[in-house]
């Protein structure tokens, strides 16, 4: 389903942020500069309409709660995405293909969809504007159309039992929404909305065949974020988000797709299913947490090629770091090629209105209203991980995931957060590797590790971890050297039960140390192994690799290199956004060319200072009445006053629209590799050029007048 929105007046979906102190109240827009309507605002407006229906007796409170849920543990029956302009995906593609970033900057793009309005407060007694009351507000232009994806929660029993009744109520509530955003009583935010129940094409979630399954399998999954994703911190802080997707969330997704009974049968099988955490991924290369032992010199920069030489403190010689001030590298993730990968996050600002809905804003008082912020992982990023399962488990997982429709994950997934593409894209057989006996290895924890000691108590004692490792290797003489450890807290809040989860400490991901065995051990036994407890949720992933003796302490990492795009013809686009940007740039350059022309001919104006003001006023009058440069020229020729006639003729000869346009077109054709010039109708060109010209002339006249007064 889709919710279609048409703006019947300008709209401001306040973002809670300001831009460059020039805009006091800004709209919400994405990284490309394209404005959108956040789903939480949209859903709140639909909820208001449904509440009005309840108050009028059109629907009951029970029917209302079936659709919108109830505060606490009753979830909403539908999810909603942000509302984007029609043709959003194509516009984003055009902007990303544009290699001229000065042209397609977010502010330039935003200006195509918005404009700035000013407002002030007037003293009712004096009729004069209040001091310091001038405000600027950016608004989205009326006439634009938006669409938001709307999907039923297929796990919701009310949706299964009464699909038509619930759908009809939602349809009525959507159609009743008439205003969105701020200043609704001042002419902003008038909209027309409707629910389109046409089924949308579903994404394919499984790209592997069950025939390829072996006895033991390692299934690769990828998650592409279509909207921001909130992975709440285990500490339960909504103002923070994890920078990865925990295996427990993926396991929960699979459980929901299977159903409770089938999932319990899956867990009861002899082999334990394991779902690793999903980490940031670039070009199919999965990142993993970097070692805590990697350090750099204080204030050490990257070299010209984007590389940095680090020191691995696990086995460094004192002479190598003597007289050097070493600091942690603070690198979050690296891929197999040691390219640094980073996760982009953002903060969005929200408010909850009071329980008394006659109050249209949060007050900050104890009336049920509040202001709050949510941290999330930015949309457009990819994450990947692995599912370890035997043949029967893998087949059941594939069947369940194949039946998924629109996938949403994380906190706030019923509104603007958590829309993802989830795909099982490849599978490899897990089989024993050829034996490789070594004495020394480097152990790195790729996820948090939960440990229990022999008394069944939670612990972070590294000696307990050593016993887990010895059990896998089949030895009893491991010696741990030079540990670099960090400790994290696991906890959170169970929304379903309305209770806090147990809080305890774990050894954090990125922790690393050396292990030595006098007897020697097979390092390949650790391939695809997890240690500790709750490994099915992604905890306990480790990497054990042989310690190489030569130059082990030197580590070279590199920044992600920007892709070099070939410069294509900008005018080969799908949506027209690039053409709008080119026209805006053309207009800006026309105005600049007019300004430069006047600056070059200042002496002409200064020599006729005594009649310049009257000449400019005459030209402004003619400009209002005539629609072409030629008509203006004809009117100037008819001026009876000889001196004024000559000055006016001189002034309009300085700036000829066609000449200015030809000059700008030539420059833009060269700068942007255009195949054909930007063509405007003569009247439009005349209006833009002479509006700018007469404004500059008027400003120049005032400067001359002030200069004369001072003398």
Predicted regions and their residues:
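Conserved active-site/ligand-binding neighborhood in enzyme cores
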Residues: 1-711
